[in-house]
Amino acid sequence: MSSLSCGTAVCVVCLEKPKYRCPACRVPYCSLPCFRKHKAPPLQQLPVCPLRLGACCCFIEQCRPAAGPVEKKIRSALTAKTKKPVENEGSLDDDDSVADFLNSDEEEDRVSLQNLKNLGESAALRSLLLNPHLRQLMVDLDQADDKAKLMRACMQEPLFVEFADCCLSIVEPSQNEDP
């Protein structure tokens, strides 16, 4: 898999060379047992997500459980490996080092870390996500075998269209503004 060919990518569980990425949070893992360990809740009590989303699937920072010792070790190692020397501090974009690591399949589809943070902090998006019907649509879409077909069906739902428009207005504000 070309997106994991980067030399700094390691499995979040065992630190081996990864072959896959978690579909929810995009962290690399090498095998099904490692994926199951990654998805399994730790033995200690997890914080309750106010939106009742899974720990891995919740993009709101406050809802995520604390990282385990292996994940902290990986993050610090990746930060050290992907940090570039700063010559012009104003010209270095924090997203560059992360982008090198993630190597998504389509460059144009990549959402910057700042935009992801903006999504997580959006009050309008949070209020939409309180709707149980929308949350069920999201779960169904995540679990669907034919995601493209279900996405077309979801885009016929006014609530889902409102959700998509809200996300796009945050991620691509200049393209959604009226002249």
UniProtKB/Swiss-Prot annotation:
Annotated keywords: Cytoplasm, Metal-binding, Nucleus, Phosphoprotein, Zinc, Zinc-finger
Binding site for Zn(2+) 2: C22, C25, H38, C49
Modified residues (Phosphoserine): S104
Biological process per Gene Ontology, one example term: box C/D snoRNP assembly
Record-annotated membrane-spanning stretches: none
Source taxon at top rank: Eukaryota
Entry's Gene Ontology molecular function annotations: zinc ion binding
InterPro entries: BCD1, Znf_HIT, ZNHIT3_C
Annotated protein name in UniProt: Zinc finger HIT domain-containing protein 3
Species per Swiss-Prot/TrEMBL record: Bos taurus (Bovine)
Gene: ZNHIT3
